[in-house]
Amino acid sequence: MATKYSGTQTEKNLEAAFAGESMARNKYTYFASVAKKQGFEQIAELFQKTADNEKEHAKLWFKELNGIGDTAQNLGAAADGENYEWTDMYAGFAETAEKEGFPELAARFRLVAAIEKRHEERYRALLKNVETAAVFARSEVKVWECRNCGHIVVGTNAPELCPTCLHPKAYFELHTDNF
């Protein structure tokens, strides 16, 4: 997406700052998990607090790059990103790993690519639901569940308010049992 920084070194710097802060956040959450498992609660909390700070720093730079849109735009961008990951990035990584004698890593790249493909499909399906106003309404009768309290409603639409906990329809999703 074009910004006032497009084509400048500042744009590259913003992209690098976003990437660096994003990677730092992930590392610190991993480090927090290790510290917690080893019994260092204070250190774990400091890693997590710093990770949360890094997330906000990354958000500053991503917003400057106009990286955050409305939900439909974000779903489209997410789907496009996942498409790149499974069709190009991981496919290329797997090919390189194979050529360099790392067949196990190549296989893992391919497995992750398959997951990224599923992510793309999920985002595209959700985007279609947003674009067709089908997130909270369907043409056929469905079972809707309040994500807050678990109340079940059967009908073509989620209710405007949950009759049990009074949360808005934004808290409803299609009910599925996976057991």
Feature locations, PLM:
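Non-heme di-metal
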Residues: 1-179
